[in-house]
Design a protein with these regions (language model features):
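Residues that form or immediately flank small-molecule/cofactor binding pockets and catalytic motifs
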Residues: 4-5, 52, 81, 114-117, ...
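Short, flexible helix/strand-to-coil boundary loops that buttress conserved ligand/catalytic motifs
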Residues: 34, 60-63, 104, 113, ...
Length: 164
């Protein structure tokens, strides 16, 4: 599935779901006395970056943390690698809804804060317009949309899980 703004001329385009960016970490990162009670507390942990440090700067600014020093923590080139590092307890990363849903639902990751950034780009289901009404295409598209909607329902029930 392509990731982008939904502009693919000549194709039938359906948004899989809206996309937000938010911090996630492994519950094992917060064992013992380690706490995350305010967004600024994240700076006491390794921040796992993807491509550059801009997403963390944007997220922290939106959460009311200005002028944070972001030169610590690894910079990885794939979101999946950053999520794997967070799962391993190596730090806190910023994750997208669709890429972290399963790990959040199953308790392998947690969201320490409800703050999130809405992203303009997301994942899309696309197919040539000539094939959009084929039964196998309709069945597959409807299944994908139902799975995404189910994940979002479970995530809403889950909410933010803090370790105190």
């Amino acid at each position: 599935m392509p990731h982008g703004d939904g502009n693919w001329p000549g194709f039938d385009v359906v948004r899989l779901s809206s996309e937000q960016l938010f911090p996630v970490c492994s519950p094992k990162l917060l064992v013992g006395r380690r706490r995350l009670t305010r967004p600024v507390d994240e700076l006491k942990f390794p921040l796992i970056h993807v491509d550059d440090r801009k997403d963390w700067a944007r997220w922290l600014e939106a959460a009311g943390v200005d002028g944070a020093e972001l030169s610590h923590g690894p910079v990885l080139n794939r979101v999946s690698m950053a999520i794997d590092a967070a799962l391993d307890g190596q730090g806190i990363t910023l994750a997208r809804t669709t890429l972290s849903a399963t790990d959040l639902i199953n308790g392998r990751l947690l969201r320490p804060f409800a703050d999130e950034l809405r992203l303009a780009k997301t994942y899309w289901i696309i197919c040539p317009k000539a094939t959009t009404t084929l039964p196998k295409i309709v069945t597959f598209r409807d299944w994908l949309l139902a799975e995404a909607a189910n994940d979002l329902r479970q995530l809403k029930k889950l909410g933010t899980r803090r370790r105190s």
